[in-house]
Amino acid sequence: MRRNFFASALLFALSASFCFAQSGSVAILEDFKPSILNQPGQEYPQVNSQRYARFRIIAPAADSVRVSLGLGGRGGTKLAKAADGSWMGTTAGPMDEGFHYYNVNIDGGKFNDPGTLSFYGSIRWESGIEIPAHDQDFYALKDVPHGHVQQV
C-alpha cells in the first residue's frame, strides 16, 4: 500500500512537470540595446537581457529577407517587412553567450549587415554579433587601487 502511494505521488509529480514545461512561450522582454559590435551610430542589431537578438535591414525593393545565424539548421531568422520598407525580426530563441558570425540573405543573395562590423571567419568576411556573458563584469577592466613597486 505504501509503495503504491509513493509510486502514484512520483507519477503525479513527473506528469505535472511535463505540463508546466509545455505551457506557452516565454514573453520576450523589450529591453533591447545595440550590440557592442555595431558600426558607430547604428541602432541594429540589438540584444536583450534574455539573449534574444533583433535585426533591422533597410531593403525596400526586396521580396524576402532572412538573417542566417547557423541556428542548428532552423533556417535562420525570417524578417517581416514594415511600411517604411525596412525589415525587422527577432530570433526564435535565446542565443548562446559569446560571438556569433551571421549574414543577411536578401532575395537569395548573401550580404553583410551594414549596421555591424565585419569579421573574417569561415573563409569569408561576415557580420558579427556579441551576446553578453552573464559574468562579463568579472573580466571587465576596473579602476582598482595599485600598490607601489620597489626593489629591496
What do these predicted regions represent?
Residues 1-5:
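Positively charged n-region of N-terminal signal peptides that target proteins for export
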Residues 7-17:
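Bacterial N-terminal signal peptides
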Residues 11, 60, 144-147:
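A generic structural signal for short, non-catalytic loop/turn and secondary-structure boundary residues
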Residues 16-19, 73, 88, 101, ...:
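Polar low-complexity intrinsically disordered regions enriched in Ser/Thr and small residues
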Residues 21-47, 93-152:
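The feature marks proteins involved in alpha-glucan
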Residues 46, 56-97, 109-122:
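Aromatic-rich carbohydrate-binding modules that target alpha-glucans
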Residues 51-55:
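Structural beta-strand segments of beta-rich domains
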